[in-house]
């Protein structure tokens, strides 16, 4: 009876049974020579590293709710970009997020071309835009998620963006699911690369707009240890925005991570297929006692150009994974585990 009480106490305090051992104590007749090997995970343990400073646990994110306006040159565009980078970095932010297709005003230069040719003209700026962002990341000591822009590769056109780290390195991410309009009007192809990114303060993922509406993508990144998911988006109407926003909140709950979204506002009367935009950028959290009850950490004013700065506490995620009211990550069955379910037959 005493041993049963001890085991009950241990299991109620998050010890986990790793295996049952036989012939552990041959002389212990009461236990029939059985023993349980238990494990307790110390979520606060930090392994020794060669880093001089400890890893950050509170990360500051900055969002740009971008106003679409006419820019005649790439220099005009980056005058506005640098203004926002300067402003957000002034608040000691670790990240700044720009929206999807923030550089669309430059397509006005190609108004004499068809929509599919105009977007390819815009793709001609992508390498220079990436390089300029990288210089800003270094100069202002901030990690930049560049939203998204078109990229031509091997005869196909993709919707991509870049993580420009403040240490001078960069990596690319791709939009996996392109919208029907992107396919019809611009001839875009869906990408195939999905990964998480290590940074100096968090492991992050990026999903471009429509991709956040497919839970499998963020689930893969959550399995890779993603702590913050960034979602640059471009939506024209409030119902389109609601799809992105509601799905973003769902991703925060089911993957026990922070989700940061940023979009564009205003209109571009001189750019085909980019008439109007609607956005309300925000930072979303899981829903548990340590987080806002509605899962909204911070939100921008709808349809107004502004920046939004918010802190997110990574330690809260670690505690949630183990001690949360519910534990979506630990309790989620892998896809193969659902093969036993009885599904209705179709005739």
Question: Could you describe each region identified by the protein language model?
Answer:
Residues 3-57:
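Terminal substrate-recognition subdomain of acyl/acetyltransferases
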Residues 1-5, 339-345:
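Conserved small/polar residues in nucleotide/adenosyl-binding loops
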